[in-house]
């Protein structure tokens, strides 16, 4: 029930108070929610960038749909999906996973071979569409975490 209450509180903010700043602790929780988001094949095919620097936000404003929001918000969080799956990216994710879990590299070899067979054969547009969907899942969980913390978002 708390989740529904938090989501009911959430809305797309149209203007921010530039004098209010979100704490590092809250930003870290929002990013952690994105990191823990489920993704197809466990690849998490995106990077999350946090922009707090005002001059950098001013540069980003030029391409924004609501430039005032980007200029005045405390932080800009960018979800940058990969352009496509590659053998190197798949290997990097699973090498990291095995290293973090103290397992031998190659333990997931048959699984990663299957992923490569599927993803590398797809056209770039299909890869990117799949990656975008995985990125939106992480974005959704980050927005949910922001709502739980009562941090406004757009």
Which positions does each model-derived feature cover?
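Acidic, surface-exposed loops and disordered segments
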Residues: 1-154
């Amino acid at each position: 029930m708390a989740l529904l209450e938090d989501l009911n509180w959430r809305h797309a903010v149209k203007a921010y108070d530039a004098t209010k700043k979100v704490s590092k602790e809250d930003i870290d929780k929002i990013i952690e929610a994105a990191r823990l988001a489920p993704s197809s094949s466990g690849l998490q095919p995106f990077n999350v960038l946090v922009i707090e620097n005002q001059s950098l936000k001013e540069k980003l404003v030029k391409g924004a749909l609501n430039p005032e929001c980007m200029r005045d918000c405390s932080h800009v969080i960018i979800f940058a999906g990969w352009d496509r799956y590659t053998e190197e990216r798949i290997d990097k994710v699973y090498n990291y996973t095995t290293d973090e879990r103290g397992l031998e590299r190659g333990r997931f070899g048959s699984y990663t071979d299957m992923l490569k067979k599927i993803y590398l054969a797809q056209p770039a547009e299909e890869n990117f569409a799949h990656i975008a969907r995985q990125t939106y899942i992480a974005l959704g969980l980050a927005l949910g975490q922001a709502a739980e913390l009562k941090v406004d978002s757009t």
